[in-house]
């Protein structure tokens, strides 16, 4: 059979079409041997290879054979059944991967927000077990400081009239970020202020309570769940908000070495995968 010849499979009543070269990508698999008529359990009926297995799960099997990637929809739970299908088709690398409980055990992120409120300032510290999440939040949080107008030291009754310049956030480590907002006074006179903006919101906020409310709302929209609140220091008015987010990897890229019958996981990418209706 030519590698460019079109092959149609009937798996449990569902039909799939692909090239014979695709099915030969894993030469030790049942699908490759099928093309050489070396498998008695797979018969040709009406010109189609008939396989008496689960057709809906075969769509994931065929996608893996085509791309060497396992793409599962969000909320997929049939890992044990899919593993049995991989074993039937003798795709050993996929079966071994599906046997690992870490594949379908959600990864838990813990994020903590510490909020210190003083008379004219509010200080924030975000800590997260995932450095990637902290990088994402650091890119979205912007801090601005008022700049003096001219060399005469003129003062303005409204701080919004002064130009604002971006100020870098503090990064004590890869897992936390520190920023602040509020008004600076010297001898009772307003001399400057710091504002905070959190993308995609366009507002520049100076009030710490408003910034806190916006920050918590954004975290909830990002899939975090608030699991606890507590006062770290009642005297200094330090409040701590602890969030949790469970994430499951949905795309795993696998480097397959068919000849040596082994594999290694190169990367694990988290991305939203939609159910594939096309076959």
UniProtKB/Swiss-Prot annotation:
It is found in: Endoplasmic reticulum. It comes from the Eukaryota. Residues 5-74 form the BTB domain. SUPFAM superfamilies: POZ domain. GO terms for biological process: negative regulation of delayed rectifier potassium channel activity; protein homooligomerization. Pfam families: BTB_2. SMART domains: BTB. Coiled coil: none annotated. The keyword Endoplasmic reticulum applies. GO terms for cellular component: endoplasmic reticulum. Residues 256-279 are annotated as: Disordered. Gene3D superfamilies: Potassium Channel Kv1.1, Chain A. Keywords: Endoplasmic reticulum. PANTHER family: POTASSIUM CHANNEL REGULATORY PROTEIN, POTASSIUM CHANNEL TETRAMERIZATION DOMAIN-CONTAINING. Inhibits potassium fluxes in cells, possibly by retaining potassium channels in the cytoplasm. This is Putative potassium channel regulatory protein. It comes from Xenopus tropicalis (Western clawed frog).
């Amino acid at each position: 059979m030519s590698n460019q010849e079109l092959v149609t499979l009937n798996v449990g009543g569902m039909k799939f079409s692909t090239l014979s070269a695709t099915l030969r990508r894993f030469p030790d698999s049942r699908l490759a041997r099928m093309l050489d008529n070396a498998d008695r359990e797979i018969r040709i009926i009406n010109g189609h290879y008939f396989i008496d297995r689960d057709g809906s799960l075969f769509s994931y099997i065929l996608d893996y054979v085509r791309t060497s990637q396992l793409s599962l929809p969000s909320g997929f739970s049939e890992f044990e059944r899919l593993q049995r299908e991989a074993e039937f088709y003798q795709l050993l690398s996929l079966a071994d991967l599906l046997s690992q409980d870490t594949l379908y055990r959600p990864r838990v992120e813990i994020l903590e927000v510490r909020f210190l409120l003083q008379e004219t300032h509010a200080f924030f510290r975000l800590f997260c077990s995932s450095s990637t999440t902290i990088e994402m939040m650091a890119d979205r949080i912007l801090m601005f400081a008022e700049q003096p107008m001219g060399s005469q030291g003129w003062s303005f009754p409204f701080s919004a009239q002064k130009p604002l310049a971006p100020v870098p956030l503090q990064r004590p480590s890869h897992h936390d970020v520190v920023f602040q907002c509020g008004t600076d006074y010297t001898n009772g006179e307003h001399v400057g202020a710091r504002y905070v903006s959190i993308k995609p919101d366009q507002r520049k906020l100076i009030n710490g309570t408003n910034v806190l409310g916006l920050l918590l709302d954004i975290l909830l929209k990002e899939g975090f769940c608030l699991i606890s609140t507590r006062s770290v220091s009642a005297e200094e008015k330090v409040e701590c908000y602890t969030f949790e987010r469970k994430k499951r990897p949905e795309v795993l890229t696998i480097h397959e070495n068919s000849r040596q019958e082994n594999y290694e996981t190169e990367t694990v990418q988290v991305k939203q995968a939609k159910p594939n209706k096309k076959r």
